[in-house]
């Protein structure tokens, strides 16, 4: 890509840019280290969130932001859902103590289980299980295994594909699932395009079995459907059938989409994924969960079947009839939604993913990426991540908090989540890689029409409280840890040496208009030369964006560490429409607008000197994360913080 012509446009572009910021996909600052102390903005925000939830639950008529709309959840409805909410951080172990618990009267008066939920209360986690299934596969399977066609793994599918190979017609593209093109990875990414429900119990004809006096013809008349026989459903009417019977029951179902077309949620896919993993490893999924994840992370209150000991039963959250909910048999559905866990254990699980405790760091980074888009600009899909693209408050409209200038950036933060909602239980785990933190919610209620919406409402309140606080805390720590003047030894001691080099790091002083938030270089003298005034930067005070950290955990940082930053001199917006609205010359659409929305990733590391990028700055940090010196890499000279 030829960029020299666009470099010349930089001064004029900077004059026109206004609005919100789009950086690399990643943090604006190093991740915050303090989420739990009395001085932490995150802890303060959590306290405010807890007060908000307390007030909400005490008001039996309405909650915050409620109106006359019939879709608004009342406090009474929220109060009827038991839930446990908790934070965690790979940098601050005490963050896991930030929790909020509410026990509904249904659970408080239940005949079985706990009557007051806490961090060690055991919930069913429903489809959050799918995240454990994929991680279990990543820990026990090779890349070759993940990319093998299912017909080479599951014999029944191979036989079906062979038996129907000679009957291929144009109609088969619509009615025949291409099992030889579907891999375990396609199932994990929800891109297989297969039928959603594999269990025959999800079929309307099952109503005939449940109510024999109402025949299939009556059902057909009620729904306007043609007559059918219950025997057409096959032998696998519930999740406790064998894997072979299950596969035979689903292999002839028509697909929803062709493989690798568009994400389509399928419980059936994760049942098949569990079958495939078990066949490839020779282990049942329950053994993989226990040995590869639960034991490895000391998740001592997590299970693949309902716990039955006296101690665990007393901690179990049981809504409604245990046989229909909490203790319902998993069968083949274990890999789709059969696990049990607690707030405490899920904090360990979330930290382990963020910290690459079980997987190599490179494998974790590869895994925590989108594999497909949805039709929405704010949601994407991974394996099996449900990725929420959270947009921080716009600095032009955020005026309510004293930290607004630090947290209101308008930037995008990707939340890697996995939800669950089945039977009497809902759940969600939210991982935020750029902050090394996250949170979980577990909930229970027999009122299925309310439980899911309540869970999502609490998640919205949590997200809107925690994300700005994490950004503001990261900004506050960055100011303390990096802002200041860095000088060469001869400059600071006024020796007779001719070396005269210094660098000043400031906050919110960048002259990249519209992108002036965060750390920046306000002055840079190298061997007596004003580098910012030189053609390298054209008089612009660049922003500094963190790129690589040498150590992440608190234990590793105790011996000191390094963090690399890239200098950014280009204006950015978070979409081309915003660039056009800002009046940038020549922006008419997505292609003319790409220079003002994604110029950083297009031009990063463009200019080198002696084999090193001139935009690379490496800071030395002490055990507290505070910078002690910086090396502008191209200058090959370390400057000490004064």
Regions found by a protein language model. Give the residues of each.
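Catalytic loop of the DD-peptidase/beta-lactamase superfamily, centered on the K-T-G motif
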Residues: 23-106, 327-642
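Short, surface-exposed loop or secondary-structure junction motifs
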Residues: 78-81, 90-93, 101-110, 162-429
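Fungal secretory targeting signals
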Residues: 1-22
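Residue-level detector of alpha-helical secondary structure
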Residues: 52-56, 136, 292
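Glycine-rich His-Gly loop
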Residues: 127, 192, 443
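Residues at alpha-helix boundaries and the short loops/turns that link adjacent helices
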Residues: 131, 143-144, 279, 283, ...
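Short active-site loop at a secondary-structure junction
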Residues: 41-44, 71-84, 109-187, 255-268, ...
């Amino acid at each position: 890509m030829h960029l020299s012509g666009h470099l010349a446009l930089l001064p004029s572009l900077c004059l026109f840019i206004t609005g919100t910021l789009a950086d690399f996909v990643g943090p604006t600052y190093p991740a915050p280290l303090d989420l739990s102390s009395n001085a932490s903005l995150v802890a303060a925000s959590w306290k405010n969130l807890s007060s908000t939830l307390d007030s909400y639950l005490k008001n039996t008529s309405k909650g915050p932001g409620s109106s006359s709309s019939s879709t608004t959840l009342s406090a009474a409805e929220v109060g009827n859902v038991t839930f446990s909410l908790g934070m965690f951080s790979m940098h601050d172990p005490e963050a896991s103590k930030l929790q909020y618990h509410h026990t509904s009267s249904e659970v408080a008066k239940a005949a079985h289980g706990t009557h007051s939920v806490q961090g060690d209360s055991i919930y069913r986690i429903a489809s959050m299980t799918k995240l454990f299934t994929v991680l279990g596969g990543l820990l026990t399977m090779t890349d070759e295994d993940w990319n093998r066609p299912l017909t080479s793994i599951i014999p029944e599918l191979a036989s079906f594909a062979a038996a129907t190979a000679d009957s291929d017609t144009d109609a088969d593209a619509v009615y025949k699932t291409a099992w030889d093109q579907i891999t375990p990875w396609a199932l994990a990414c929800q891109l297989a395009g297969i039928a959603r429900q594999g269990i025959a119990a999800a079929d309307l004809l099952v109503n005939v079995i449940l109510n024999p006096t109402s025949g299939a013809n009556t059902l057909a008349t009620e729904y306007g459907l043609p007559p059918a026989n219950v025997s057409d459903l096959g032998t696998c009417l519930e999740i406790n059938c064998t894997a072979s019977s299950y596969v035979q029951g689903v292999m002839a179902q028509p697909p929803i989409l062709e493989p690798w077309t568009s994400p389509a949620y399928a419980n059936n896919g994760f049942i098949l994924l569990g079958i495939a993993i078990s066949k490839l490893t020779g282990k049942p999924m329950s053994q993989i969960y226990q040995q590869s994840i639960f034991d490895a992370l000391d998740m001592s209150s997590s299970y693949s079947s309902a716990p039955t000991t006296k101690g665990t039963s007393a901690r179990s959250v049981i809504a409604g009839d245990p046989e229909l909910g909490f203790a319902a048999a998993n069968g083949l559905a274990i890999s789709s939604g059969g696990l049990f866990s607690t707030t405490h254990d899920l904090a360990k699980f979330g930290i382990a993913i963020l910290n690459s405790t079980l997987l190599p760091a490179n494998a974790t980074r590869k895994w925590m990426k989108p594999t497909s888009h949805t039709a929405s600009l704010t949601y994407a899909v991974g394996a099996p991540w449900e990725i929420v693209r959270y947009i921080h408050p716009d600095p032009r409209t955020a005026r309510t908090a004293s930290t607004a200038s630090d947290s209101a950036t308008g930037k995008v933060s990707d939340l890697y989540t996995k939800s669950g909602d089945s039977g009497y239980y809902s759940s969600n785990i939210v991982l935020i890689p750029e902050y090394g933190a996250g949170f979980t919610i577990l909930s229970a209620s027999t009122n299925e029409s309310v439980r899911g919406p309540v869970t999502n409402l609490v998640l919205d309140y949590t997200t809107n409280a925690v994300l700005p606080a994490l950004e503001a805390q990261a900004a506050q720590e960055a100011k303390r840890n990096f802002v200041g003047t860095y000088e060469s030894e001869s400059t600071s001691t006024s020796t007779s040496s001719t070396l005269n080099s210094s660098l000043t790091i400031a906050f919110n002083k960048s002259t990249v208009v519209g992108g002036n938030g965060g750390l920046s270089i306000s002055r840079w003298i190298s061997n007596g030369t004003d580098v910012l005034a030189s053609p390298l930067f054209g008089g612009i005070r660049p922003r500094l964006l963190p790129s690589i950290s040498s150590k992440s955990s608190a234990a590793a940082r105790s011996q000191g560490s390094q963090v690399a930053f890239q200098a950014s001199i280009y204006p950015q917006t978070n979409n081309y429409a915003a660039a056009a609205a800002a009046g940038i010359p020549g922006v008419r659409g997505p292609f003319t607008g790409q220079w003002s929305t994604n110029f950083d990733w297009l031009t990063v590391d463009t200019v080198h000197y002696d084999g090193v990028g001139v935009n690379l700055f490496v800071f030395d940090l002490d055990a507290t994360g505070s910078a002690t010196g910086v090396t502008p890499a191209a200058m090959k000279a370390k400057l000490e913080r004064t």
